[in-house]
Design a protein with these regions (language model features):
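Ligand-site clamp/hinge motif
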Residues: 204, 233-279, 308, 320
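N-terminal export signals
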Residues: 7-27
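Alpha-helical secondary-structure segments
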Residues: 122-129, 160-166, 214-215, 243-245, ...
């Protein structure tokens, strides 16, 4: 049985791909007492700060659920009935509207925008956050540069609610690049209050203590064990989520995750092995969901030192058998 955004989680349990985690704010409260969703995954969240050097992919969910961006991608129901991003649609998030010219992007922020602590979101917060992504280097800087966002001098505060990006070159990727997780907007007042001379960008503080405006807040984080989200009751970038609390537990063993799901001890299990997914697909009360994997490159790299991969025809046959579409 396929589900759409509104009927998602009507069944007792679901096995999904990890990319569903960013959709937490869209889940209806129909599991675990209608208030709490319990999920298990095999991966480990190693930081709550996506800009921090070494932050891994499982941690991206924190940036999406706890922080907002100027804009976001739309969503759509895929042909198989599952929820997916719609990369052809750019929607406002912190921004209320924007204007595009050949020289610049000018954003008007929502006057109602608030961080989790009630502090108003300003253009100064956006600039500080963008400056930080570039200054810390590594992947955040690479991602920003993919949209020709390369120099802090490009980012200009016009007034509290007006933020301008001066374009160094025309690029069709600039606006979409603002909707990916990296250009998250941080509460600069909180961050600066916890910065030091040795750590001017508050990486140690934000590593464990997010300062965002997203649909969820981090209630607690026990590294290697669990992450607990709680709903932002005063969310200003969209509707307040239906689900009040989400507990994401780290369970390395696929067999254990499967057992927890089958017993009804959890509502969601992520990264289900193909074998388990096939075996569970026909069980009443369980729903296997798939989602496209975003922002990733998968490669098949045979070891050419061994047969049969030294044979060009074998390599061609493998290439032709891959369903690229």
């Amino acid at each position: 049985m396929n589900t759409n955004r509104r009927s998602f989680l009507k069944l007792g349990g679901a096995a999904l791909g990890a990319s569903t985690l960013p959709f937490l704010k869209m889940l209806p409260a129909q599991a675990a007492g209608e208030d709490v969703i319990v999920a298990v995954m095999g991966q480990t969240i190693n930081s709550l700060d996506l800009h921090r050097t070494g932050t891994n992919r499982p941690s991206y969910q924190v940036a999406v659920n706890v922080y907002d961006r100027l804009v976001s991608f739309g969503t759509k129901t895929a042909e198989d009935g599952n929820l997916s991003y719609d990369y052809s649609v750019i929607e406002p998030e912190i921004a209320e509207s924007w204007e595009e010219t050949k020289e610049a992007l000018i954003f008007k922020l929502k006057p109602s925008g608030k961080f989790h602590d009630g502090t108003p979101i300003t253009a100064a917060d956006v600039k500080w956050s963008f400056d930080r992504a570039l200054a810390l280097g590594g992947f955040p800087a690479v991602q920003m540069k993919a949209g020709s966002l390369e120099d802090p001098k490009q980012f200009e505060v016009i007034d509290d609610l007006t933020f301008k990006i001066n374009l160094i070159r025309p690029s069709k990727l600039t606006l979409p690049d603002l909707a990916v997780p990296i250009p998250m907007v941080i509460n600069s007042k909180v961050a600066l209050a916890n910065a030091t001379t040795e750590d001017p960008w508050a990486t140690e503080y934000l590593h464990k203590t997010p300062a965002g405006s997203g649909a969820f807040m981090v209630e607690r984080w026990d590294p290697g064990q669990q992450l607990v989200y709680t709903r932002n009751e005063n969310y200003t970038s969209g509707p307040v989520p239906a689900v009040k609390r989400v507990i994401v537990r780290e369970v390395p063993s696929p067999a254990t995750r499967r057992a927890l799901l089958e017993r009804g001890d959890v509502n969601l299990s992520f990264n289900m092995p193909n074998k388990d997914a096939k075996e569970l697909a026909g069980i009443d009360g369980l729903n296997i969901q798939t989602t496209p994997i975003e922002n990733s490159i998968y490669s098949l790299c045979p070891n050419l030192a061994f047969e049969p991969f030294q044979d060009k025809r074998v390599r061609q046959a493998i290439a032709w058998s891959v369903p690229y579409q």
